[in-house]
Design a protein with these regions (language model features):
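C-terminal charged capping/lid subdomain of soluble metabolic enzymes
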Residues: 215-288
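Active-site segments that bind and position negatively charged phosphate/pyrophosphate groups
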Residues: 106-239
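A glycine/threonine-rich phosphate-anchoring loop and its flanking beta-alpha core
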Residues: 14-114, 209-210
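Alpha-helix C-terminal capping segments
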Residues: 9-16, 31, 160-162, 180-181
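Short glycine/serine/threonine-rich phosphate/pyrophosphate-binding segments
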Residues: 3-9, 47-50, 166, 170, ...
């Protein structure tokens, strides 16, 4: 899974570094050499088997940060859906939610390539269609194959070619949450995504057509059944929320998840200081 593959990437990078491995996480430019890495993926989730980055947590400092270098591409990865059939239902769901978030981060940008738009919409439909299938029948190799192939394409840049770069704001926020609280990454993303997308829609009305297209082409709604684009866009987010709940994502608020505002200021400061992209790179205006 992602944690194992990402830890392996950090070990490969740190093998030739004369100092703590965390140095490399804080300053990715220090990665000057790396051991070759082979991965055998056993869950459809992070896409780390086909990208050059890792996410590393420091439990002593409550930090969860990216480590990226072109020296960290796996030399070879074995991607066999048969290895995923014993994944627990809750981890399968978390993996699908992670996959969806990877693509939505690259979809809700101000300028998207038509090719990327169609690719992402098709992948999102694939994940939404096949996740309930494997929950009902974990041994369905066809559905497992679709989920695994979808997740593998999430973070290697293919889905972003020709589009405006995204600062991946949902991941920036979720990393702060799961760095401090015991929340599975994919579930945290599923909790945050509908809320963040509503913020996008509120702050950037120019996204309305994108949201309407998402509602139609991803969530399967019909535009002629709604009085306005605004109503269609909101219905798409409602249906996204309903999908998450249907596959077992907890319908909870922050309080129910054991999260209060104690660390919000520190978390916001950490995003501003350490995230790989500045706040100005996010698709809509963000402030601490």
């Amino acid at each position: 899974g992602g944690s194992t593959m990402d830890a392996s990437k950090a070990i490969c990078a740190a093998a030739g570094h004369d100092g703590p491995a965390w140095d490399l996480v804080l300053d990715n430019s220090l990665v000057n050499d790396a051991l070759p890495l082979m991965t055998v993926n056993t869950i459809a989730a992070t896409g780390s088997e086909y990208d050059n980055s890792a996410v590393i947590s420091n439990i002593e400092t409550n930090e969860k940060l990216p480590l990226a270098s072109d020296l960290l591409w796996p030399v070879v990865s074995f991607i066999d859906p048969a290895y995923t059939i014993t994944v627990l239902a809750r981890q399968t769901v978390a993996g699908s939610c992670d996959t969806m978030s990877h693509f939505m981060e690259q979809y809700f940008v101000k300028d998207i390539s038509p090719v990327a738009e169609g690719l992402i919409e098709g992948i999102l439909r694939t994940v939404i269609r096949n996740t309930p299938v494997v929950l009902e029948n974990p041994g369905d190799l066809d559905a497992r194959s679709e989920l695994l192939w979808a997740s593998t394409l999430g973070c290697n840049g293919i889905a972003a070619l020709g589009s405006q770069a995204s600062g991946w704001p949902c991941h920036a926020i979720e990393h702060e949450v799961s760095a401090r609280y015991d929340i599975t990454h994919g579930i945290g993303l599923a909790f945050l995504t509908p809320r963040l997308l509503r913020y996008f829609l509120e702050k950037a009305p120019e996204f309305l057509d994108r949201f309407a297209g998402f509602a139609e082409r991803v969530m399967g709604l019909r535009a002629d059944e709604f009085d306005s684009c605004e109503a269609l866009a909101e219905a798409g987010l409602v249906k996204l929320d309903a999908f998450y709940k249907s596959v077992g994502v907890p319908a909870a608020g922050l309080a129910e998840l054991g999260i209060d505002n104690t660390h919000f200021e520190a978390m916001a400061e950490h995003v501003e200081k350490h995230w790989f992209a500045p706040l100005e790179a996010f698709p809509v205006p963000f402030t601490r």
